């Protein structure tokens, strides 16, 4: 076959493979159930941001500000998210948080294509929710509209670490509460997640405003045009969420099927490695001493990857989650 023919064949194959990969990635996207789930994420995030951020408005105004009521804010955010999870969890999984969605992708709970639409819906919902709050709030008390900011005595690194920690405890709570392998969970999952959000606020409001949710910070920032240290509220929560999801799913409570597949893979690799060593020893016994002296640079490469790869079960089941 000529080089030109080979190139044309490879081009057709590459184009076909690429198109097929895209179709597989977006499988299930154009369904009614999918768009219901995306709409649920949009509406849930809108309501959550509207109610939660609304609790941060200081009605004393800038001239006579009232003391920050941490308990009020913490309970409002916690109860709001618990309510949204209870309402929309069975429709979309109740992520309501881009950090949670990214953690679900990293633990293979949802597809990348679905996560993209979820995050877009969450961000749009947060913007609309913050916009509605801005419209219904008197200009004299709107203040910063609940934009999350790092305390003046803290560095950006401190703020990043605080957001990582509080999001870690939230997402770990989500994975633990929604674990279908557990039989000891008898209470309300939504309430457990709500308590986790409230705890994070009680601890971190004075540090960073206690975001734990990139969309919650994104909506008010867009409306007010305040982007000071905004990257912290994306990087910190996403890092904490991915770390929590990975530790729970692959270290503390790994799936039985996943453990079995990993055990088989390691066992197969060990057998192949052992066989390659035996082959090297057999070849070495046939080499004459003079060959070793005359050809010191000869290297024998043994292919140990001839075993057929076994496809594992795709664990893409939805997980109830929040914030």
Curated annotation (Swiss-Prot):
Taxonomically, the superkingdom here is Eukaryota
Q: Which stretches of this protein does UniProt put in the Extracellular compartment?
A: 58-69, 137-155, 206-208, 223-231
In the record, Phosphoserine modifications are located at 111, 180, 276, 285, 321
> In what way does this protein cross or attach to the membrane?
Multi-pass membrane protein
* Record's keyword annotation contains Transmembrane: yes
Report the subcellular localization.
Cell membrane; Basolateral cell membrane; Endosome membrane; Cell membrane, Sarcolemma
InterPro entries (alphabetical): Aquaporin-like, Aquaporin_transptr, MIP, MIP_CS
What are the protein's UniProt keywords?
A: Cell membrane, Cell projection, Endosome, Glycoprotein, Lipoprotein, Membrane, Palmitate, Phosphoprotein, Repeat, Transmembrane, Transmembrane helix, Transport
On this chain, the residues bearing Phosphothreonine are 289
One GO term in the molecular function aspect is: water channel activity
Main localisation, per the record?
A: membrane
Q: Which reaction does it catalyse?
A: H2O(in) = H2O(out)
Which biological process terms from the Gene Ontology are attached to this UniProt entry? Answer: cerebrospinal fluid circulation; cerebrospinal fluid secretion; establishment of localization in cell; intracellular water homeostasis; multicellular organismal-level water homeostasis; protein homotetramerization; renal water absorption; sensory perception of sound
Q: Which SUPFAM superfamilies match?
A: Aquaporin-like
Q: Where is the lipid attached (S-palmitoyl cysteine)?
A: 13, 17
For this chain the motif NPA 1 maps to 97-99
Q: Which residues lie on this side of the membrane: Cytoplasmic?
A: 1-36, 90-93, 102-115, 177-184, 253-323
Residues modified by carbohydrate are: 153, 206
Transmembrane portions of the chain: 37-57, 70-89, 116-136, 156-176, 185-205, 232-252
GO cellular component terms listed in the entry, alphabetical order: astrocyte end-foot; basolateral plasma membrane; cell-cell junction; cytoplasm; endosome membrane; extracellular region; membrane; plasma membrane
Outcome of gene disruption = Mice are born at the expected Mendelian rate and display no obvious phenotype. They have normal urine osmolality under standard conditions, but display reduced urine osmolality after 36 hour water deprivation. Adult mice display incereased brain water content. Mutant mice display a reduced rate of water flux across the blood brain interface. Fluid transport from the brain paravascular space into the surrounding interstitium is abolished. Besides, mice display strongly reduced solute clearance from the brain interstitium.
Task: Fetch the Gene3D superfamilies from UniProt.
Answer: Glycerol uptake facilitator protein
Q: What is known of its domains?
A: Aquaporins contain two tandem repeats each containing three membrane-spanning domains and a pore-forming loop with the signature motif Asn-Pro-Ala (NPA).
Role noted for this protein: Forms a water-specific channel. Plays an important role in brain water homeostasis and in glymphatic solute transport. Required for a normal rate of water exchange across the blood brain interface. Required for normal levels of cerebrospinal fluid influx into the brain cortex and parenchyma along paravascular spaces that surround penetrating arteries, and for normal drainage of interstitial fluid along paravenous drainage pathways. Thereby, it is required for normal clearance of solutes from the brain interstitial fluid, including soluble beta-amyloid peptides derived from APP.
> Quaternary structure per UniProt?
Homotetramer. The tetramers can form oligomeric arrays in membranes. The size of the oligomers differs between tissues and is smaller in skeletal muscle than in brain. Interaction between AQP4 oligomeric arrays in close-by cells can contribute to cell-cell adhesion. Part of a complex containing MLC1, TRPV4, HEPACAM and ATP1B1.
Q: What is this protein called?
A: Aquaporin-4
